[in-house]
Amino acid sequence: MAKSMATLDSGTTCSSWNQSGDRLAAGSLNGKLSIYESSTSSSSTFSCTSKVRVSESSIVKIVWLPSEYGDAVACVCEDGSLSIWEELSEDAHGLEWKLCKSMKNKSSQVLDVQFGVSRKSLKMVAAYSDGYLRVFELLNPLELKNWQLQAEFQNVIDSLSTLGKPSSLSASVSWNPMKGEEQEPSFVLAFNSDSPHLNSSKIWEFDEAHNRWLAVAELALPEDKGDPVYALSWAPNIGRPYEVVAVATHKGIGIWHVGLAPDLEGRLPVKKVSSLSGHQGEVWQMEWDMSGMTLASTGSDGMVKLWQSNLNGEWHEQATLEPVPS
């Protein structure tokens, strides 16, 4: 029989587990951030231990920073603002969540944010409603308030395709989670916009020699390049000679293999190996397990589906989890 782990406040709009899975952050319609944790290490029941108002508008996304940078979360709000909050000790008051950094662009809204650890620093990638991507670098690992803009560009392969000011409903960013010390950081980015050039999923890799980001692959068949993308997820890689990335559009979930050896032009070979269907409506979110072997997806139909491939590389639906009426 299923057991409830936590009861979230009514009006909860999003949630996110930290890397160790012992704390849950939840955002609400009223702009409040709530932190849930268990009272003991052996308990599987979580209760709210902290609550702070982040914004006057609703929180639409929460992302935990990598654990080596402390207990901190980034919140994206409906008004397009982005803020970073850190749990700090305040003398007699004990631990409290404090605002470290707030960002708001007058002309565009933040749609998604993700963090990636490079060999030199922590990087933050923020995707905006005007189709631009901004990469920020943390200047001091001990101070989450000091971020420097490192790069700014649109999600297009060549400069001739650079657009004026498109309108984007959503964006999705997913970092390559298993980059080694000797490898450059990379991530995949896609949009759900009115501009076909922006939408398709593109892998961006940092070129340290020239201090710039380069598009090294595009995850879309020729007939699908203009399709809006709803969600992305880059799988952890444990010993595979290729990377695996999941891309969700209105046509379903595409599973892509990305080669590790670039061609003479610096592009990585890509191949779509499977198309998964089963959700009745849009796919909103996808996550891989730690092994990169099982993909979980959820969407507007309220279902959670688990997908796996067999030894022959054929993908299939492994399980479906339905919401339980309250």
UniProtKB/Swiss-Prot annotation:
It comes from the Eukaryota. WD repeats lie at residues 7-46, 54-95, 105-146, 224-266, 278-317. One of its GO terms (biological process) is protein transport. SMART domains: WD40. GO terms for molecular function: structural molecule activity. GO terms for cellular component: cytoplasm; nuclear envelope; nuclear pore. Disulfide bonds: none annotated. Keywords: Cytoplasm, mRNA transport, Nuclear pore complex, Nucleus, Protein transport, Repeat, Translocation, Transport, WD repeat. SUPFAM superfamilies: WD40 repeat-like. Disruption phenotype: No visible phenotype, but enhanced susceptibility to virulent Pseudomonas bacteria and oomycete pathogens. It is found in: Nucleus envelope; Nucleus; Cytoplasm; Nucleus, Nuclear pore complex. InterPro entries: Sec13/Seh1_fam, WD40/YVTN_repeat-like_dom_sf, WD40_repeat_dom_sf, WD40_rpt. Pfam families: WD40. PROSITE patterns: WD_REPEATS_2, WD_REPEATS_REGION. Belongs to the WD repeat SEC13 family. Part of the nuclear pore complex (NPC). The NPC has an eight-fold symmetrical structure comprising a central transport channel and two rings, the cytoplasmic and nuclear rings, to which eight filaments are attached. The cytoplasmic filaments have loose ends, while the nuclear filaments are joined in a distal ring, forming a nuclear basket. NPCs are highly dynamic in configuration and composition, and can be devided in 3 subcomplexes, the NUP62 subcomplex, the NUP107-160 subcomplex and the NUP93 subcomplex, containing approximately 30 different nucleoporin proteins. Required for proper export of mRNAs from the nucleus to the cytoplasm. This is Protein SEH1. It comes from Arabidopsis thaliana (Mouse-ear cress).
